[in-house]
Amino acid sequence: MAQQRALPQSKETLLQSYNKRLKDDIKSIMDNFTEIIKTAKIEDETQVSRATQGEQDNYEMHVRAANIVRAGESLMKLVSDLKQFLILNDFPSVNEAIDQRNQQLRALQEECDRKLITLRDEVSIDLYELEEEYYSSSSSLCEANDLPLCEAYWRLDLDTDSADGLSAPLLASPETGAGPLQSAAPVHSHGGGPGPTEHT
């Protein structure tokens, strides 16, 4: 079995080794199972006692059952080796799987590109509308400041005249009230001097 487990280098020899292992394991399972069935048959005439024959048959059945289990494990190992062989040496299948995966990724990339282009167009349209709204509102606010020079000068004169007209009454109001304020001033008498003389 150890010589059968050694994996040759060439693919052809390796496949032949796999085939031989498969046949040997299947033959081992069939032979041991057949012998177990034969052992289960009860014989009438035996050279040894029935108890001794029973113990011998029991031991033989255990050994052959262990051989069947070992052959089954060998088949499972063979399946694992075949999978590894196909993965490492089946280049057409590997290339086909790689090409299929590349096609899936390219389709996904194209779909992402289309979505990004659509999103870019929508953002551009919204940005353009926002710019138009911003500049239109800014221009309406700046129309009052963007007047011609003569009109701006005329408005400046009007503002100056209105300011002068408002300040003139404020300046004149103290003069009109000066007379009564002066006439109402109290007369201070000198305590040590003579009082006012009366002229006749």
Swiss-Prot record:
One GO CC term on file: mediator complex
Please report the name of this protein according to its UniProt entry: Mediator of RNA polymerase II transcription subunit 22
Which organism is the protein's source? Rattus norvegicus
Q: Where is the composition biased (Gly residues)?
A: 190-200
Q: Which domain of life is it from?
A: Eukaryota
InterPro entries xrefs: Med22
One Gene Ontology MF term: transcription coregulator activity
List the residue ranges of the region (Disordered).
Answer: 167-200
> What are the top taxonomic ranks of the organism?
Eukaryota, Metazoa, Chordata, Craniata, Vertebrata
Q: How does it assemble?
A: Component of the Mediator complex, which is composed of MED1, MED4, MED6, MED7, MED8, MED9, MED10, MED11, MED12, MED13, MED13L, MED14, MED15, MED16, MED17, MED18, MED19, MED20, MED21, MED22, MED23, MED24, MED25, MED26, MED27, MED29, MED30, MED31, CCNC, CDK8 and CDC2L6/CDK11. The MED12, MED13, CCNC and CDK8 subunits form a distinct module termed the CDK8 module. Mediator containing the CDK8 module is less active than Mediator lacking this module in supporting transcriptional activation.
